[in-house]
A protein has these predicted regions:
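Conserved, structured core segments of small domains
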Residues: 1-125
Length: 125
């Protein structure tokens, strides 16, 4: 089964305007790198990346008529994604165990979501 581990860092939350030039503390990056290496020995790590702050992003909203483009930051947004891991594991519990070991900062959140398999969309006759 594949799972997304979605990092919701405290530094991006609460409508905080994070400087477009923001980069995480090098010591935290190194610590996270060690965590990623260790996790990759246990789970199949398919992809991972950190995301620039929402101040550097844009959002496309679909409603009636033409889509609307809004440049970041998105003050009305409750939680802002800061990075992700895409892993393959035997169970959600296995992923939760690794998420709990993450060297996250106080106030950070990791959300675990299972990825749909193509079999999940198979039409049943």
């Amino acid at each position: 089964m594949q799972f997304m581990m979605l990092m919701i860092p405290a530094v991006y939350q609460g409508g905080k305007k994070v400087d477009p030039g923001f980069v995480p503390d090098p010591k935290k990056v190194e610590e996270m790198g060690r965590f990623n290496d260790e996790m990759a020995k246990s789970l199949k790590l398919l992809s991972l990346n950190g995301l620039h702050p929402a101040t550097m992003g844009a959002r496309v909203s679909f409603g009636k008529g033409k889509p609307t483009v809004t440049d970041g930051p998105f003050i009305e947004t409750k939680e802002v994604l800061g990075g992700y891991w895409l892993v393959e594991a035997k169970s959600k519990e296995e992923v939760l165990t690794w998420a709990q070991r993450c060297p996250a900062a106080e106030g950070d959140v990791i959300e675990i979501r299972q990825v749909f398999d193509k079999e999940d969309f198979a039409i049943k006759k």
